[in-house]
Amino acid sequence: MIKVSDLHKSFGKLEVLKGIDENIEKGEKIVVIGPSGSGKSTFLRCLNLLETPTSGQIWFDGQCITDKKTDINRVRRSMGMVFQHFNLFNNKTVLGNITLAPIQLKLMNKEEANENALRLLDRIGLRDKADAYPSMLSGGQKQRIAIVRSLAMNPKVMLFDEPTSALDPEMVGEVLEVMKELAHEGMT
């Protein structure tokens, strides 16, 4: 599903990624562990080209996505990414956050996107928060909404960048439970 070959990433003279090779099969779960500043987030951001690698190749679903001709926005539709600080739009309701991308990218009409969002909210026990704004949610709720927002695009793979690091210890379990369910269902 994802193949990384001789991946390098530098910021000026600082080489953060030094020749990474990795092969991730469909349904496989990979955890990248290392100290702060070791390049974990940079690696994840390179996988969907939020960061442009200095050199090397990344293949996703049989396509070389580091090829300049690749429509990376099209590729990203199949890669969900959840960040450590939620990145929800504060001016939109929970429902608006979840349905924005599927509607804007014309993957679903508004009615379909709303139905899909409500189904996903049911799944994580937060349907009652559909009309709430992010400022009204706990950290754990915000992160579960961020996961659902990515799932609303029906991705083939989910990338999680320290999804529990910004949470209070008592909120971590809520988010990990959603991640365990995804793993059990075979999400890569």
Where are these regions (language model features)?
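ABC family nucleotide-binding domain
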Residues: 1-188
